[in-house]
């Protein structure tokens, strides 16, 4: 999933701004999308796994995220191992925004 795919996703667009973002891997690992956002390389956005999740509002106002190009791939950092978010879909419930890997 890249930045444009996330921002153009109808579920994501309609989600409340204070909801945290959760990533669910294909092997059912549930990972909080960390509040540390880095875009050190052109075309890639990294979310570090930390104890505090990032909300939709925090993500949309994050300087690194704003500056990243629309085609930047989103990667989740699992304690040093960077996992690409390839084929994903987004669901929203009352408590969070779920990015779910196929």
Q: Which residues make up each language-model segment?
A:
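Short, intrinsically disordered N-terminal pre-domain segments
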Residues: 1-5
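Detector for the mature cores of small, proteolytically processed
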Residues: 12-102
